């Protein structure tokens, strides 16, 4: 029988492996994306690096578990064979996978089987909701544009939100979900504010809207982070005759050197949403060295095309290479043991009996 020290040593050796791994690219519509899309590029670059890949369309995907062989497989709709997900497999999640609860439940299944993902379900749910992101970052004291929720289209609700931002125009109106600059409107008058809110709620009465302080700037910055490490940053210049600076809307991008304070704040934001591979967007302060930037949002599925052009290096290849180091693979913690109710000196109590029988890992106390 092996000693405890031998077991621990073996675990460390496994973690330090840097040979090719197995990769599942789980995306909303991988069949329809262009060849310049990040999902396609990940698959293409991974194969050149010797990484075995499986491109999985989340709509219709399902997981099977063979209890006898202890094998987990993920399947595209109509694919009976599927793809085996073992301890050497990681899942990269791309796109807006929050459209249906079943999509998120599939991610939870993957996590429960101990398969690591580039971002957790928790991270994705926070990042896909702009107000939830705002609240999470507010909890850790991040500098952000002042933001309020407009719960409905009543004049009172709109006025309250307007007053909370000191009645100063212009303001920015945003839907809680949406990316690439979609669902973001610059509001310059009170009349425009009420009409836009009414229009949005007429189209979808169950939507949620944010009103946000407008920060004057000619550009914003996208910083890409993998495992608490900044792998690239780009300056996105404001589009002509538009206040937005999204590269997907035509904004010109270029390399930018971040200050140490900006780096610290971006890393803090990524950690705040529990993100491992994320893009952090911010507007620099007037004094970039001494003043914290305004954090705008954190993107769990940041694109690769614009940032690769800005830093003149393929960021998908950089990310794939970083994950060769198994030490950065992060699995969601699993509860082990069972809760039991018992009586001590006439009083009923609930305690946790940790036998190790309800988990695939060993717990030591």
Map each language-model feature to its residues:
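ATP-binding N-terminal substructure of ATP-dependent carboxylate-amine bond-forming enzymes
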Residues: 2-118, 156
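C-terminal active-site "lid" helix and adjoining low-complexity regulatory extension at the edge
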Residues: 4, 10-13, 257, 271, ...
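Active-site nucleotide/adenylate-binding loops and adjacent lid/helix of ATP-dependent enzymes
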Residues: 20-32, 36-43, 73-75, 81-86, ...
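Protein kinase-like catalytic core scaffold
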Residues: 171, 232, 278, 294-297
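Phosphate-binding site of ATP-dependent enzymes
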Residues: 182-269
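A short glycine-rich, hydrophobically flanked beta-strand micro-motif that places a catalytic Asp/Glu
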Residues: 212-213, 275-287
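Short beta-strand micro-motifs enriched in acidic
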Residues: 224-226, 283-287, 354
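Aspartyl protease active-site motif detector
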Residues: 338-365
């Amino acid at each position: 029988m092996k000693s405890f020290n031998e077991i621990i040593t073996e675990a460390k050796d496994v973690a330090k492996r840097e040979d090719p791994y197995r990769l599942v690219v789980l995306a909303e519509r991988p069949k329809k994306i262009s060849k310049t899309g990040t999902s396609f590029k990940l698959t293409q670059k991974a194969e050149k690096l010797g990484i075995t890949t499986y491109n999985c369309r989340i709509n219709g995907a399902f997981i099977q578990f063979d209890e006898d062989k202890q094998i987990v497989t993920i399947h595209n709709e109509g694919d009976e064979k599927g793809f085996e997900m073992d301890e050497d497999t990681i899942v990269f999640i791309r796109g807006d996978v929050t459209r249906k609860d079943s999509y998120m439940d599939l991610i939870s299944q993957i996590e429960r089987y101990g398969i690591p993902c580039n971002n957790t379900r928790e991270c994705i749910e926070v990042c896909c909701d702009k107000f939830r992101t705002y609240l999470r970052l507010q909890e850790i004291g991040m500098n952000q544009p002042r933001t309020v929720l407009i719960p409905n289209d009543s004049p009172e609700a709109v006025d309250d939100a307007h007053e909370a931002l000191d009645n100063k125009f212009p303001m920015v109106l945003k839907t809680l979900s949406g990316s690439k600059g979609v669902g973001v409107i610059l509001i310059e008058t009170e009349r425009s504010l009420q009409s836009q809110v009414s229009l949005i709620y007429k189209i979808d009465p169950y939507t949620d809207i944010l009103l946000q302080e407008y920060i004057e700037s000619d550009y914003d910055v996208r910083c890409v982070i993998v495992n608490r490490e900044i792998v690239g940053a780009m300056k996105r210049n404001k589009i002509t005759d538009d206040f937005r600076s999204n590269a997907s809307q035509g904004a010109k991008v270029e390399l930018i050197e971040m200050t140490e304070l900006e780096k610290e704040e971006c890393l803090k934001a990524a950690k705040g949403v529990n993100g491992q591979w994320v893009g952090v967007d911010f507007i620099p302060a007037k004094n970039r060295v001494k003043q914290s930037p305004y954090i705008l949002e954190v993107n769990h599925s940041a694109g690769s095309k614009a940032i690769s052009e800005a830093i003149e290096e393929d960021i998908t290849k950089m990310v794939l290479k970083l994950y060769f180091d198994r030490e950065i693979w992060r699995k969601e913690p699993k509860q082990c043991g069972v809760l039991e109710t018992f009586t001590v000196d006439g009083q009923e109590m609930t305690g946790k009996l940790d036998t190790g029988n309800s988990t695939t890992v060993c717990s030591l106390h």
